[in-house]
Design a protein with these regions (language model features):
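Surface-exposed, short loops/turns at beta-strand junctions within beta-sandwich domains
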Residues: 213, 266-268
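Structural motif
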Residues: 175, 196, 259, 274-275
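Short, acidic/polar N-cap/turn motifs at the starts of alpha helices
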Residues: 61, 91, 253-254, 269-271
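C-terminal trimerization/auto-chaperone modules of long, extracellular attachment fibers and adhesins
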Residues: 262-264
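Carbohydrate-active catalytic/glycan-binding domains of CAZyme proteins
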Residues: 1-238
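Residue-level detector of functionally pivotal "anchor" positions at catalytic/ligand-binding pockets or at interdomain
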Residues: 237-260
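C-terminal tail/sorting-segment detector
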Residues: 271-282
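A glycine-anchored, Pro-Gly-centered beta-turn/N-cap motif
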Residues: 130-133, 268-272
């Protein structure tokens, strides 16, 4: 899914590099054999993100929706890396960064936790609240996510992006698997800039529940480079103090277990294990 914009409904529509959306001749524009990288990406094939156990890819057939309060959403279908052509519908909230480009929330929409107005008029997280260790996911161009390259690529793990770990330090530096700098910009807003391995991103900070967890809020950052490459970051907003959990039986069935290994219902409060991951339910 790509984004172009224009000052006029009649165009011309261009991306951040000034490349037009209109082609003068046929050019393959997806997959690892693509001849052009035009358009600002919203997302690509990815896996192991948050609590997801099945990777998602080949997102498309999308529609945009804006509610009466100006909150925007992208509705699309996604395929999976499980060896089938089955698909499901997903909804991600959209935000606008300081450069006027759309960026997609890192997780599926499960209820309004951050509004478009809040991003533009409030500092949802102060700098000290943003300091910490994050998972980061980059969505590059030329991912092998469509069947022009290989019949199985539409539903395989080919070129699926996996998260790295970085730390946003109090001195404005970024360390870990990727390095760079970060800074909040425009006082009274939730705009942020990041530099990751030499690439500059403009984005927003938002609060959002992690996928597959109904009540686990995360500190999230969604951003895009001027060349159209998106970056997602998140860290859990709450911590249980448990660093790791050993599970001797399969817990990828969606059932909820307490720390004694007993199955509990969705109303159970406290530390539980869901799909092999710890969750604090309140």
């Amino acid at each position: 899914m790509r984004v172009f914009r224009s000052d006029s409904p009649e165009g011309p529509f261009t991306d951040g590099k000034g490349t037009p959306a209109v082609y003068s001749s046929y050019q393959l524009n997806y997959g690892n054999n693509s001849a052009t990288n035009r358009g600002m990406k919203l997302m690509g094939a990815y896996g192991s993100w948050g609590a997801m156990t099945t990777g998602e890819r080949a997102q498309g057939h999308n529609s945009a929706y804006v509610d009466d309060n100006g909150n925007a959403f992208v509705v699309y279908h996604t395929k999976f890396d499980n060896g089938t052509y089955g698909h499901q519908v997903r909804v991600h909230q959209l935000f606008v960064n300081s450069e006027g480009w759309l960026v997609a929330a890192p997780f599926r929409f499960t209820g309004l936790q951050t509004t478009t107005t809040q991003v533009a008029t409030q500092r949802i997280y102060t700098a000290d609240k943003l300091v910490g260790t994050y998972k980061v996911l980059i969505h590059p161009y030329k991912q092998n996510c469509a069947y022009n390259d290989n019949v199985s690529a539409s539903y395989s793990k080919a070129n699926e992006q996996k998260p790295h770990t970085v730390t946003l330090n109090a001195d404005g530096t970024i360390s870990g698997d990727m390095t760079g700098k970060w800074a909040l910009t425009q006082e009274g807003t939730s705009y942020i800039t990041l530099s990751l391995n030499g690439r500059e991103y403009n984005g927003v900070t938002i609060r959002q529940n992690m996928d597959y967890y109904a009540d686990v809020p995360a500190v999230c950052i969604t951003a895009v480079s001027q060349t159209g490459v998106p970056a997602w970051l998140y860290k859990e907003e709450t911590s249980t103090g448990i660093q790791s959990v050993r599970v001797d039986h399969n817990t990828t069935d969606g059932k909820i277990y307490n720390l004694l290994g007993q199955v509990v219902d969705s109303h159970y409060q406290g530390v539980v294990i869901v799909n092999g991951k710890k969750v604090l339910r309140r």
